[in-house]
């Protein structure tokens, strides 16, 4: 296993095949006047530079320091995220799952790769692998171990299956020793993987 891609697997098509298919579809849409190349470039720039797990990290940091916001986030995640200017396509209906000392939540999309884009950006390749989609349900502790996290035996692992209608993400536990951290410092500890639930935030000593 590698640090960058703990879950091994492949997609039904190679990256080269997928890229070629996307380019062909773009060309058809542009030729038919359904979309412009400028619009495609703009959307690519947004998801590469403006949308990503850094937004989810800021929301988590706010929840860690503001109990009232945390309650709103757990009650109506979509609305609470909008308070911080986060929302939109692929995040119309979101639910946030709180990790505790006795429960660890982990998110998967067993059907395809449904994912809360406004909060986490584009999904990593491993999230789309059939191996992850199957093993997250069948052997969640084994998958977590491959990501370097081993919950205590008495911690309940809950698996949540995202769909096109409802997308889940995780509110991790706040690391110990961060009582005097600012929101910005706390956000730096939150990783994409911890928001999916396959890992936990970075500890202050490792940040």
Curated annotation (Swiss-Prot):
Comment on bound cofactor: Binds 1 Co(3+) ion per subunit.
Any GO molecular function: transition metal ion binding
Cofactor: Co(3+)
Reaction equation(s) it catalyzes: an aliphatic primary amide = an aliphatic nitrile + H2O
Family: Belongs to the nitrile hydratase subunit alpha family.
Enzyme nomenclature, EC number: 4.2.1.84
Keywords: Cobalt, Lyase, Metal-binding
Residues annotated to bind Co(3+): 109, 112-114
Record's keyword annotation contains Metal-binding: yes
Biotechnology: Industrial production of acrylamide is now being developed using some of these enzymes.
Induction (record text): By cobalt and urea or cyclohexanecarboxamide.
Subunit architecture: Heterodimer of an alpha and a beta chain.
The protein's name: Low-molecular weight cobalt-containing nitrile hydratase subunit alpha
Enzyme class: lyase
Highest taxon of the lineage: Bacteria
Organism: Rhodococcus rhodochrous
């Amino acid at each position: 296993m590698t640090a960058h891609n703990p879950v091994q697997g492949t997609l039904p098509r190679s990256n080269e095949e997928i890229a070629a298919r996307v380019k062909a579809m773009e060309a058809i849409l542009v030729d038919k006047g359904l979309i412009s190349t400028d619009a495609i470039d703009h959307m690519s720039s947004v998801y590469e530079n403006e949308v990503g797990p850094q937004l989810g990290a800021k929301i988590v940091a706010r929840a860690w320091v503001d109990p009232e916001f945390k309650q709103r986030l757990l009650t109506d995640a979509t609305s609470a995220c909008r308070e911080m200017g986060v929302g939109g396509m692929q995040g119309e209906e979101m639910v946030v799952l709180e990790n505790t000392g006795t429960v660890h939540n982990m998110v998967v999309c067993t059907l395809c790769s449904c994912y809360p884009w406004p909060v986490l950006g584009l999904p990593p390749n491993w999230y789309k692998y059939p191996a992850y989609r199957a093993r997250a349900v069948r052997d969640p502790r084994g998958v977590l171990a491959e990501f370097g996290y081993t919950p205590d035996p008495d911690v309940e692992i809950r698996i949540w299956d995202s769909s096109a209608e409802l997308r889940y993400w995780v509110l991790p536990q706040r690391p110990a020793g961060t009582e005097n951290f600012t929101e910005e410092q706390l956000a730096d500890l939150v990783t994409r993987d911890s928001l999916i639930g396959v890992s936990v935030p970075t500890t202050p000593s490792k940040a």
